[in-house]
């Protein structure tokens, strides 16, 4: 199947399509605490759409921001493209669609940002680490782990 990726403006039609796809993502229950987007969640981000014969197959949105202070990872003022969301319909996963979306955003951000950054709350952390580390050649810099304490409200 032939697909294309393009950057899109947040028109009412684009926002409605992204919100509908994010509702599908929420229904999957594949990410801890994920809820469908509102227009406010998307506005202010750069939007990249993966389209094919079946319409909208996936999306990535994010934005460039400057780090505020020095950290063990990077110096203050470093420009980073923060990927807020990357989603591909289940029937189009494991076909290179997500990687293509990421690489398109990466090429678009080149020259504006020094790094690409992403956080994830997926329940399938092994697969997502493989995707970002092995397929997209990202570096692993930090992790945030949680444990529910028994007997706590």
Regions found by a protein language model. Give the residues of each.
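A short beta-loop-alpha structural element at the N-terminal edge
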Residues: 1-18
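Active-site rim helix/loop that mediates acceptor-substrate recognition in acyltransferases
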Residues: 26-49
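Conserved beta-strand in the GNAT
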Residues: 49, 55-64, 82, 87
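A conserved beta-strand-loop-helix scaffold within acyl/acetyltransferase catalytic domains
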Residues: 60-74
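Conserved acetyl-CoA binding element of GNAT-fold acetyltransferases
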Residues: 74-90, 143
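Conserved acetyl-CoA-binding loop-helix of GNAT-fold acetyltransferases
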Residues: 88, 94-107
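Conserved beta-strand-loop-alpha-helix junction that forms the acyl-donor binding cleft
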Residues: 93, 116-129, 146-150
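Conserved active-site alpha-helix within GNAT-family acetyltransferase domains
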Residues: 99, 122-142
């Amino acid at each position: 199947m032939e697909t294309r990726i393009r950057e899109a403006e947040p028109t009412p039609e684009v926002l409605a399509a992204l919100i509908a796809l994010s509702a599908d993502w929420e229904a999957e229950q594949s990410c801890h605490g994920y809820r469908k987007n509102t227009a406010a969640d998307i506005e202010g981000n750069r939007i990249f759409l993966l389209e094919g014969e079946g319409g909208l197959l996936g999306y990535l949105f994010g934005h460039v921001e400057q780090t505020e202070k020095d950290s063990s990872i990077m110096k203050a003022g470093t420009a980073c493209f923060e990927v807020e969301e990357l989603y591909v319909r289940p029937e189009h996963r494991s076909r290179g669609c997500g990687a293509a979306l990421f690489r398109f955003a990466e090429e678009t951000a080149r020259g504006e940002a020094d790094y690409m950054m992403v956080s994830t709350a997926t329940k399938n952390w092994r697969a997502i680490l493989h995707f970002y580390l092995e397929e997209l050649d990202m570096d692993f810099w930090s992790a945030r782990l949680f444990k529910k304490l028994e007997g706590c409200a």
